[in-house]
Amino acid sequence: MDKNTRRQFLKNSAVLAAGAATLAWNDTLWPATKPHLTFPTQPRERIAVASWPFRMFIEAPANKWARDPKLPGMDLTEFPAMVVKRFGVHNFEPLDQHFPSTDSVYLKKFRAAVEKAGCHVVDIPCDVKASFYHTDRAKRKVAVEDGKKWVNIAVELGSPSIRTHIGGPPKLTPDVDRTAESLTQLAEYGATKNIIVALENDDNRTEDPFFIVKVLEKVNNPYLRALPDFCNSMMTHDQDFNNRAMEAMFKHAYNIAHMKDEEGDDKGKFRTVDVAKCFEIAQAQAYRGYFSMEWEGNGEPYAGTQRLIDETLKYLR
């Protein structure tokens, strides 16, 4: 190799090495192509408990409407230890309304309580208080930015996902294109943090399961997923519709689903769901994530949640 050739070779090598170093450093700035989570395989370890059914006990400014002063109070920091002691479950879902604060001091205190209890946050259901499909772009941006806030909170608490409501003004028809545009931004942000954004068939007007699936398929981002709720769609539809809804939702589910066997409306009328069929559908779709117990039935939440756990253990293999 002559001097000129050798000099050029060394120069090129230096450039390539510098480029490789830059790429290696920048790799941490690029989002993962898909979520990288490891799920437990033992049935009980796939069970979580939602804080929503226990809202009448939880002390938090945003939860005053649900707090029953006749019952003993509970701060959210006490919830994970209760879940472990009472139910022998080590996963839970804290609702956004149940956080008395989201400042860094409280979040550190909360995470310490979670770790001390030997528990894990597996999802944070939140309401962005805005609409992802509003006709006003500025209002859609509010939803996206609030969603990003909860993604950051999920990072601080070690949660793999958030569940956000889609939201929408009462007289505005849900719009796939505007919803997809907004949620593309949130999913892309979640990807940079390895945090999944989940959509639940919760509100039967703004979050119809088949509307959700259209949005998911349009966005086509592995960080935007479905959160199938066993019974929510039964409030306005029949079992056949629910079966089709669960099949559509579980095709797009990844890490979290809500298990319940019944749900009541504002008039005290309860609807039940075919739980066995829901688990059959989840298994057929090779769902490997968590099932969070979200009791909504008659009676009190401790016994109701235990019943859901016992029922779930019959079907998980």
Task: State the predicted function of each range.
Residues 61, 91-92, 180-281:
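Acidic/histidine-rich catalytic cores of soluble enzymes
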Residues 98-99, 168, 201-203, 238, ...:
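Structured beta->alpha junctions
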Residues 153-174, 193-202:
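Active-site groove signature of glycoside hydrolases
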Residues 114, 274, 278-290:
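P-loop/Walker A phosphate-binding loop and immediately adjacent motor/lid segment at beta-alpha junctions
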Residues 2-156, 174, 191, 221, ...:
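N-terminal pre-domain/capping segments
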Residues 91, 161, 256, 289-290:
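Residues at the N-termini of beta-strands
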Residues 292-296:
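Short acidic/histidine-rich active-site segments
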Residues 15, 120, 160, 196, ...:
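Residue-level detector of anion-binding/catalytic polar loops
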